[in-house]
Amino acid sequence: MPSPESIDLINAALVSIGQEPIASLDNTTEVSPVVTAVKAKLNILKRELLRSNDWNCARITTQLNRLTNVDTRGWKYAYQLPITPECLKVVQFSVDKGETFIDLDDYYNRNAGPREVLFDIDNKILLCNIEEVHIKYTADIDLSKFDASLASAFVAMLAAELAYTLPASVRLADYLERRANKKLKIA
């Protein structure tokens, strides 16, 4: 469950929409519409936000462990993507044993013309023709690890999402969504 620092971010979002702060998401003795709404949206929104950008605070560099006895579907090698913390998105890939990294957004999106596919991902397994793989990836980190700008954007986005449910105000939700988008651009 979320850390105390994470509860602070959740409460900042709740207060933004006129709701009372909560002490915990773990209270199982009474059913609270606020806690239910937060639980329904929290993890989805956090993971979506983390995947949306290459955040410094969520980027991890690692060498992948090669797997054996795995169907490589025509590729030479198979590697397990990180599980703890979970790899949400591979953002950079090294073809030279970690000496230099290729930014995948630049490689696939910003250069004109067809590009060689460097790897494929199937069920949390990275398939490629590189003998030793190093990646930089966006990890599913705890909210307490967010830097200040990302935390601020998250609070605004959570408030916007919750505004549709808790005060049930489309107008407030639309305003908060615009505010969240501005904060996201700054982050």
Predicted segments with their positions:
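Glycine-enriched, solvent-exposed interface loops adjoining structured elements
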Residues: 1-187
